[in-house]
Amino acid sequence: MFNDIPVFDYEDIQLIPNKCIITSRSQADTSVTLGKYQFKLPVIPANMQTIIDETIAEQLAKEGYFYIMHRFDEDSRKPFIKRMHEQGLIASISVGVKACEYDFVTSLKEDAPEFITIDIAHGHANSVIDMIKHIKTELPETFVIAGNVGTPEAVRELENAGADATKVGIGPGKVCITKVKTGFGTGGWQLAALRWCAKAARKPIIADGGIRTHGDIAKSIRFGASMVMIGSLFAGHIESPGKTVEVDGETFKEYYGSASEYQKGEHKNVEGKKILLPTKGHLSDTLTEMQQDLQSSISYAGGKDLDSLRHVDYVIVKNSIWNGDSI
């Protein structure tokens, strides 16, 4: 049925440069607008327990970056919103679709967060559509992100239900094994799936998963993403919440998927795994490097801002961009 869809992923694509029109890469504007707010970069650290905690969320918000707090400490979400608002910072939280979450959303009327992400593995579901409608009824000013999905039909349905943005990506992440455990997903063709979904979208798309290099951020924007959610590149920092482990004198940080047994606390419907990543310095350094690399991407695109990346040509090179090398 879908054999006529071009299938490719990040490592299969090279973007083609245009004439540079800026005198310094620092002139390139990497900012992005989502809802009523502008942020420094079109990247979001994944809303996973080994990536973000309240301290990191606060740091990101203060420095002008977008964040989404995970939903795995349910009782702390309301105090978190209050604490962020007391500091004049945006509150961005996650919810699931269980019955208790409906009451929780209703309880936020007095102090509504600016952003809510409905965060489940298979977002093309009646349960997600119902939750979108509930949030929009109870908290009409809150920006709703819904996901995750992998088809144009799913994007259209969630947008029609009231979602302000959709998150695209099922199983392409480094610690997600959905594609292996279930046979379904966008693993191995995430960039093509993003392109496919973006053609149907009327609202922002957030590409989620499969990002392995900073250049993949530019490629995501080229193929229709407004923002990019990233896990592994944000894991393993000194500040990261993941447990620190020492192996043969080297320091590592734990990084595990949201559907792993380590997250769930039980071995049931497991679609995630745990890995150890070498500790890699401070989060702020990674964010700075991401911005600099994205500014370089904009300069190669021949523009001054992120929009220039959407209009460049590209070639499909089928796994050959590394030419036998690795980063």
From Swiss-Prot:
Keyword Oxidoreductase belongs to the record: yes
Family annotation (InterPro entries): Aldolase_TIM (IPR013785), GMP_reductase (IPR050139), GuaC_type_2 (IPR005994), IMP_DH/GMP_Rdtase_CS (IPR015875), IMP_DH_GMPRt (IPR001093)
Entry keywords, A to Z: NADP, Oxidoreductase
A cellular component term, taken from the record's GO annotations: cytosol
UniProt binding sites for NADP(+): 205-228
PROSITE patterns per UniProt: IMP_DH_GMP_RED
Recorded catalytic activity of this chain's protein: IMP + NH4(+) + NADP(+) = GMP + NADPH + 2 H(+)
GO biological process: purine nucleotide metabolic process
Enzyme class per UniProt: oxidoreductase
SUPFAM superfamilies xref list: Inosine monophosphate dehydrogenase (IMPDH)
The protein's Enzyme Commission number: 1.7.1.7
HAMAP family, A to Z: GMP_reduct_type2
PANTHER family on file: GMP REDUCTASE (PTHR43170:SF5)
Function, as annotated: Catalyzes the irreversible NADPH-dependent deamination of GMP to IMP. It functions in the conversion of nucleobase, nucleoside and nucleotide derivatives of G to A nucleotides, and in maintaining the intracellular balance of A and G nucleotides.
Protein name, per record: GMP reductase
Organism, scientific name: Streptococcus pyogenes serotype M49 (strain NZ131)
Classification of source organism: Bacteria, Bacillati, Bacillota, Bacilli, Lactobacillales
Gene: guaC
